[in-house]
């Protein structure tokens, strides 16, 4: 569907060359909801603009449905861009026009008759849940409603791809969830391929089936959402995921609050992560029956990501030291990732033990 091959983007600032995107290769399949995540300045917004040549790459190829965009004439490129819709953080609505007219403007230069355009606009407004706001003006709408108008406008040309550049960044959490639910519906109902640019891993977790992580213009890690969330390799990816899963907040509370001090004395504080069918197995209960190691759960979270269960626990382990080591080995053999956070109440450099089958 979308192929980016060896993409580089450089900007000249006086005598200095800024390389915003460095040797990026991406493959996005039809029907994907593909998240590209990174901090500000990572190059993700530049990269998404390359996908429809709003930003021409310094080098590399952009291929959409087998067509290399860089080889098209201006007329051919304009035609190809109709298959690629785009929405932004800011809505760019025309304040003096009604919601109906804002969407209709996208159809102004098509060959559709006035009646066909009216029917199309009404269909789009119904699709995004704004059929009752057709005669309203942008100033009468909330931020979430304005973004729905922008989505309807972007869908006017019946695109196969929708590029979303920080589309939820200006919205509150509840409205963000509603917009993401709408995008998911469009993906499923229309078969729309969506590329989502964001700095929030929570957004990726909620909607994306694949994700790429960018840092300093490079894609440092990419894969399925389940793969990235269950076994992140890069430090930056781990930081993003820990923020999205609230593990660090739980750890801070556990390690700083007096109420937990006695529970950490002469015990190991361990973080456990597991995925898929492992969440169905009573592994914690078996630690005592097999090794006489008691596990006290201080924090736990199980959630579904792309219909796959992901679990995270923070536990204390007590018992004979050699038995604790055997218990950890058993967890690892069962496919659990274990991170020893503290030993006997003393903080230590985290030791990550990766389990897998």
What residue ranges belong to the model's regions?
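ABC ATPase NBD coupling module
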Residues: 69-85, 109, 114-115, 228-232
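Conserved ABC transporter NBD signature motif
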Residues: 60-68
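A short, surface-exposed alpha-helical micro-motif characterized by mixed small hydrophobic
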Residues: 204-206
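ABC ATPase "signature
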Residues: 222-223, 231
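Conserved signature/switch motifs of ABC ATPase nucleotide-binding domains
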Residues: 136-139, 156-157, 164
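Conserved ABC ATPase "signature" region
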Residues: 68, 104, 108, 115-132
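Helix-to-loop junction immediately C-terminal to a conserved catalytic motif
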Residues: 52
């Amino acid at each position: 569907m979308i192929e980016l091959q060896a993409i580089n983007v450089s900007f000249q600032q006086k005598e200095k060359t800024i390389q915003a995107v460095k040797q990026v290769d991406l493959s996005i399949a039809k029907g994907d909801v593909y998240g590209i995540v990174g901090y500000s300045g990572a190059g993700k917004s530049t990269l998404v603009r390359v996908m429809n040549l709003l930003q021409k790459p310094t080098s590399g190829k952009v291929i959409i449905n087998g067509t290399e965009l860089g080889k098209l004439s201006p007329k051919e490129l304009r035609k190809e861009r109709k298959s690629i819709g785009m929405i932004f953080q800011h809505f760019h609505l025309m304040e003096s026009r009604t919601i109906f007219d804002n969407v209709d403007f996208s159809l102004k230069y098509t060959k559709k008759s006035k009646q066909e355009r009216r029917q199309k606009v009404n269909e789009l407004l119904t699709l995004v849940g704004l059929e009752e706001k057709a005669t309203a003006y942008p100033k009468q709408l909330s931020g979430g409603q304005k973004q729905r108008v922008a989505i309807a406008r972007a869908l006017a040309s019946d695109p196969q791809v929708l590029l979303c550049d920080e589309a939820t960044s200006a919205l509150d959490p509840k409205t963000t969830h509603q917009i993401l639910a709408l995008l998911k519906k469009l993906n499923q109902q229309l078969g729309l391929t969506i590329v989502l640019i964001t700095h929030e891993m929570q957004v990726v977790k909620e909607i994306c089936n694949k994700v790429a992580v960018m840092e300093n213009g490079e894609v440092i890690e990419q894969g399925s959402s389940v793969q990235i969330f269950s076994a992140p390799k890069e430090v930056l990816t781990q930081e993003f995921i820990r923020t999205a899963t609230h593990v660090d907040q739980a750890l801070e509370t556990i390690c700083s609050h007096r109420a937990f001090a006695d529970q950490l004395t002469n015990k190991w504080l361990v973080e456990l992560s597991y995925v898929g069918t492992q969440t169905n197995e009573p592994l914690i209960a078996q630690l005592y029956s097999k090794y006489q190691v008691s596990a006290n759960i201080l924090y736990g979270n199980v959630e579904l990501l792309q219909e796959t269960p992901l679990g995270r626990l923070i536990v204390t382990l007590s018992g004979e030291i050699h038995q604790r080591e055997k218990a950890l080995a058993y967890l690892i053999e069962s496919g659990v990732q274990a991170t020893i956070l503290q030993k006997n109440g003393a903080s230590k450099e985290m030791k990550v033990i990766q389990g897998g089958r």
